[in-house]
Structures are given as structure tokens and as C-alpha cells.
């Protein structure tokens, strides 16, 4: 079979996406693929333009497949339709969109999704909050951009699973530690922040949790520093990123997620080899670290 050419479009280069990019390249090398990774700097217009340029290139220059994690929850429907019409396979990674089933009616190319269960990840974080705050309290949530599918789904899951006697305040950030540090620092300067009332901080990734923690610990007040050192911080990420933070007591607990890229690439290659559509949607695993039962003993 001719060497497959695959382009991977990632929204940014945060810790999770960096790992996705590394896995794309190493898996591509192992399987003998022509693999290219591009990034959109969290800009949906940039991502759309990058992909359309590839789709509209000459037939000789076009890839066999695009593996895409959309920047926003809208999910690049028109771009996906253009790709499939041009005979390019379309794979959604780490997100869910509402048009995959429709596109799969065209048997020309593989179309499928490999994703984290973002809603379930949020539910796990909500259960961690419940384990740590059985009497209720106030939680500072440091979350990704409003238009991000990941941010929306994780928030909804967390909100459903957390106890009703837990109140949340949300800070918005880009998907980086530095952005979370800046957002939290700016919020602390507001007269209405009332930082002292919060009994837990939950980040939608471990980077957001760590960035917020650094900002909160930068206070000049010894009493406030002591408070934040004793406050539970929660994060989300792959095992190699979050377990050392929990073991090092930077985070109290984390939701451990999995990368999607390896499964997406291997599934795609098999689809080309067998000329058959893969399952429409595959979900990778997530779990609490430590286990929820053990976490309840930490309160």
C-alpha cells in the first residue's frame, strides 16, 4: 500500500497537546506514515484556514487523512464536508461533533471520532469535590475558554456531580499555566474577589491548577500563604503529568485521562487497510487518582 500521508491539526501546544503531537510523530514513524502536525494557537479562524488550504491544494499534495481536534465546540462542519468531498478521511480527536454520523453515509473515506469522555471527566472531578467537601463550601474553578468543547463539557459534568451545597466561582483562562497564573492574579486584585472564602481550587487541567496555585501563593500575607498551602487543588491530565504532582502534594487529587492520538492513528490505518468504516465513536478511559474512597479519607 502507498505510504499514507496524514495531517494532524491540534488547537495549541499545552502539555496534553504536546504529548498528542509527540505520539502522532512517533506512531507515524513506527507505522511508516508521512505525518505532519500543525497547531492553531487556540484560534478557530486560523485552524479553519489552515485546513482549507490543505484541502484545496492539488490532488498530489493532499493528505489521505486529517486528524483534527477543533478549537471550538462548533467543530468545523463545513471544513469536514469539504475534506470528505475531496476524498480526505476525517477523524475527530478529543472532541465530539454532531455531524460525524451524517458524513459516514458517504462510503468514500473513513470518518470517525476518538475522544476522552469530557462530560465523565467533569463528573469525576465533581465527585472528587464531593469527597473533599462533604459539608459543602466554596470552590474556585479555573476553566478553559468559553467556546471550547472540552471546557463546556467538563464544566457541565462537574456541575452535575458536585454537591448542591457547594458554590462555584469560575475564572476563565487559555489552556496554559501562564495564562491561569495571569487570570488568577488579575482576579485577586479585584476588591470583590474575596479569595479567603474558598476551600478548594479546581482546574480543568493540571496546568490551570498549578498556574492558579502559583498566583495564590504569591501573596505577601503569611496567613494567606498558609491558607493556600493547606487548600486542596484539583487538576486533570495524563498519568505521567498529574501523578507526580499529586505525589508531590502540589495537587490533592487529579482526574487521570488518556491520549487519543495513538488509537486514532492505528484505527485510521486499519480502516484504509480493510476498506471498512471503523466504529463511529471510541472513548478512552479516565479515572480518579487517588481513588475516590481513598480521597474521602484526606478531608
Predicted region positions:
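Immediate post-signal peptide segment of exported/extracytoplasmic ligand-binding proteins
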Residues: 1-6, 29, 133-136
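Hinge/cleft segment of the Venus flytrap/periplasmic-binding protein
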Residues: 2, 142, 161-162, 256-299
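Extracytoplasmic "Venus flytrap"
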Residues: 3-23, 27, 36-54, 69-73, ...
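Short, solvent-exposed amphipathic alpha-helices that sit
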Residues: 16-31, 121-125, 149-167, 179, ...
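Short beta-strand elements in bilobed, periplasmic/extracellular small-molecule ligand-binding domains
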Residues: 29-44, 138-141, 162-181
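Hydrophobic alpha-helical segments within soluble ligand-binding/sensing domains
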Residues: 47, 112-139, 180, 237-243, ...
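Hydrophobic alpha-helical
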Residues: 62, 68-88, 169, 173-244
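Flexible loop/hinge segments that line or gate small-molecule binding clefts
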Residues: 78-120, 239-245
Amino acid at each position: 500500500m502507498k505510504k499514507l500521508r496524514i495531517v494532524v491539526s491540534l488547537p495549541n501546544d499545552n502539555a496534553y497537546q504536546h504529548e498528542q503531537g509527540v505520539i502522532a510523530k512517533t506512531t507515524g514513524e513506527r507505522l511508516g506514515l508521512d505525518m505532519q502536525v500543525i497547531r492553531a494557537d487556540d484560534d478557530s479562524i486560523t485552524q479553519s484556514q489552515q485546513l482549507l488550504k490543505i484541502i484545496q491544494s492539488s490532488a498530489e499534495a493532499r493528505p489521505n487523512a486529517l486528524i483534527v481536534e477543533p478549537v471550538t465546540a462548533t467543530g468545523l462542519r463545513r471544513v469536514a464536508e469539504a475534506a470528505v468531498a475531496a476524498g480526505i478521511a476525517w477523524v475527530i480527536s478529543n472532541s465530539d461533533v454532531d455531524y460525524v454520523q451524517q458524513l459516514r453515509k458517504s462510503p468514500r473515506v473513513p470518518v470517525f471520532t476518538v475522544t476522552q469522555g469530557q462530560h465523565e471527566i467533569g463528573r469525576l472531578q465533581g465527585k472528587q469535590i464531593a469527597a473533599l467537601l462533604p459539608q459543602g463550601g466554596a470552590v474556585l474553578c479555573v476553566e478553559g475558554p468559553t467556546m471550547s468543547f472540552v471546557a463546556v463539557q467538563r464544566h457541565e459534568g462537574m456541575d452535575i456531580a458536585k454537591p448542591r451545597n457547594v458554590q462555584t466561582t469560575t475564572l476563565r483562562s487559555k489552556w496554559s499555566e501562564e495564562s491561569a497564573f495571569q487570570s488568577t492574579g488579575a482576579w485577586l486584585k479585584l476588591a470583590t474577589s474575596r479569595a479567603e472564602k474558598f476551600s478548594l481550587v479546581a482546574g480543568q487541567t493540571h496546568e490551570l491548577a498549578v498556574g492558579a496555585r502559583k498566583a495564590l501563593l504569591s501573596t505577601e500575607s503569611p496567613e494567606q500563604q498558609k491558607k493556600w498551602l493547606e487548600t486542596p487543588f484539583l487538576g486533570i491530565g495524563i498519568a505521567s503529568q498529574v501523578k507526580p504532582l499529586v505525589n508531590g502534594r502540589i495537587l490533592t487529587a487529579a482526574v487521570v485521562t488518556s491520549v487519543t492520538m495513538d488509537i486514532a492513528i492505528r484505527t485510521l490505518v486499519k480502516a484504509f487497510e480493510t476498506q471498512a468504516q471503523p466504529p463511529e465513536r471510541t472513548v478512552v478511559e479516565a479515572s480518579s487518582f487517588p481513588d475516590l474512597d481513598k480521597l474521602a479519607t484526606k478531608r
